Structures are given as structure tokens and as C-alpha cells.
Amino acid sequence: MSYVRTALLGIAFLAMATMALSTPAIAASGKPKYYFKISNIISQDEKIIPVARELLEKEVASRPEFTMDLGDANSEEAQIAEIHKQGMLGFQVSMRIASLKVDIKPPAPGKRDQQMAIDVKLAVFGHTLPGNKLLFTGDGDASLMGEFSERLKDKEEDRFMRTALSSAIKQAVSTAVAKLTTAKLEDRKSGKGKKSKAKP
């Protein structure tokens, strides 16, 4: 599956670079700074929604700066109170899968098996909780192509789909983290500027 590996290598490096630029101080603190409540997953292909939600939740859970767990706080009022109690920022996060294409191509020269090409483009959106104000977005895309055995077509398509979605989601979340960190720093600078102007 060298085609798959090659197609995703650049995406992996981009995601790692974005993560490195985001917020090492948050990760070092060991305490979540943001609460993410996964809400809508939008896709023309409704069959892919459960998988997309699972992969988005997995990606968010892998990052120490985020949490999706507020204990027994079930109502929105209780969630907001718990967010403030823990000193976090809360966001309602949604994801839109803009395009998801699967193409079957002829075998590569000298090969017997056909090739499967998958291309996915998506975006995540974060609205403040409370407030419902759009604060950040993150775009992600991934393309891969690999050989597959006809008798294992369905299984390979599922595996390829998960790989492409996972890579695109990682890229989108990494971009969102960078934007979220930048927005927070700008708010702090703005706050300091207002305080300094208030002095006589």
C-alpha cells in the first residue's frame, strides 16, 4: 500500500507542524482548557456520519487540551456552570463533509489488482458555549490511492475511507487549534490594551 502511505505523508507532516505551532504550554499544564461538545455532522452521504463522528471524537479525545467530559452535567445550564467552574472555554463543535469521492481505476502498469482512489474535503466549526458565536473553523482534506483485491473491495473501501477521513479530520482540528490559540492571545492583548487606556 505504498500509494496510500505516500499520499498521506505530506498531510501527516502538515498536521504535525500545525500542532507544534498551536499551544505547547496547554499540553504541558496537563489540564484541559477547552470543552468540546460535538453536535452536528453534516454529509450528503448519511451512512458515513456515524464513522465521521467516531473519528472526530477520537481525534478530540487524543488531545490533552480538550475534554468532552463534564461528569454529570447533562443540561446546557449545568454544562455552562461546570465549564466556568473548571475555568475552561466551551465550544459546540460541528463538522461538514463537503465532498467524499470514491473512484475505481485500472490496475497500474504491470499490476493485476485495480486501484481505489478516495478524496475527502471537510471543515470543522466551533461556536462559543454559551453565546453561539462562531470563533474558529478548520479545513482538512486528504487523498489516497491504493490497490485492492476485488473479493475484499467492501472491506478495503471501509479501511481506505477511515484512513482518509481520519487524516482530513486531524488536519482540520490542528488548524482549528491554531486559530483558537491565536484568537485567545488576541483577546488577551485586546484586554490589556483596554486596561492601559483606562489609566490616567
Model-derived segments and spans:
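Solvent-exposed loop/turn segments at secondary-structure junctions
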Residues: 75-78, 99-103, 142-144
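Short secondary-structure boundary motifs at beta->alpha junctions and helix caps
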Residues: 112-117, 127-179
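Short acidic low-complexity segments
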Residues: 69-87
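Bacterial N-terminal signal peptides that target proteins for export
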Residues: 1-11
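Bacterial N-terminal signal peptides
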Residues: 9-20
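Gram-negative outer-membrane beta-barrel proteins
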Residues: 42, 103, 146-148
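Surface-exposed short loop/turn segments
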Residues: 81-135
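A structural "domain/chain start" motif
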Residues: 21-74, 141, 150, 177-200
